[in-house]
Amino acid sequence: MKHNTKKLVLSGLFLAIGLVLPFLTGQIPEIGNMISPMHFPVLLCGFICGAPYGALVGLILPPVRFLLFQMPPLYPVGLAMAFEMATYGLVSGLVYSRVQHNIKGIYLSLVPAMVVGRIVWGIAQVILMGLSGGSFTFQAFIAGALINAVPAIVLQLILIPLIIAALHKAKILK
């Protein structure tokens, strides 16, 4: 299979996983917010397929999921998530393409992606809430990006490196 075709097929797979993975939380928004199941396939897509594919999957996943399952709500949550997850896929892919493919390199790619993605989410929330006449405070940002997201952050910091390292060890990734 040609390299670009493989990346396209894998991106479709990550999109599909992102569509169904939230069902593991029972569609309960509070649990979904804590675990962030849609973030995992986007981060993996950035690592495995590269920045453009990861960014595109991240950008289209929330709106497509809304169209199919009416979750997450498109405005402002889904749109802010789309920018956040596009950033996850973009940054993880860009940084990972420039570092050694070992555990240190995985973390050097994952942590900036998580930080920048959450900052982009906050900026998107400020803009989207401002457009609708609402407000998004710094306290809401801290709660949404950090405090409520601690379980997701911990899971991402554990599982993403394990998955990428296992794929390298199995020689599935080069």
Report residues per predicted region.
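Hydrophobic transmembrane alpha-helices
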Residues: 1-48, 52-56
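Alpha-helical transmembrane segments in multi-pass membrane proteins
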Residues: 10, 14-18, 42, 46, ...
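Interfacial aromatic-anchored transmembrane helix boundaries in multi-pass membrane proteins
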Residues: 20-37, 60-95, 129, 139
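Membrane-embedded alpha-helical hairpins and interfacial helices in multi-pass inner-membrane proteins
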Residues: 27-32, 70-79, 99-174
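Hydrophobic transmembrane alpha-helices of multi-pass small-molecule transporters
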Residues: 40-43, 62, 66, 85, ...
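A cytosolic-side transmembrane-helix exit/cap motif
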Residues: 54, 58, 127-130
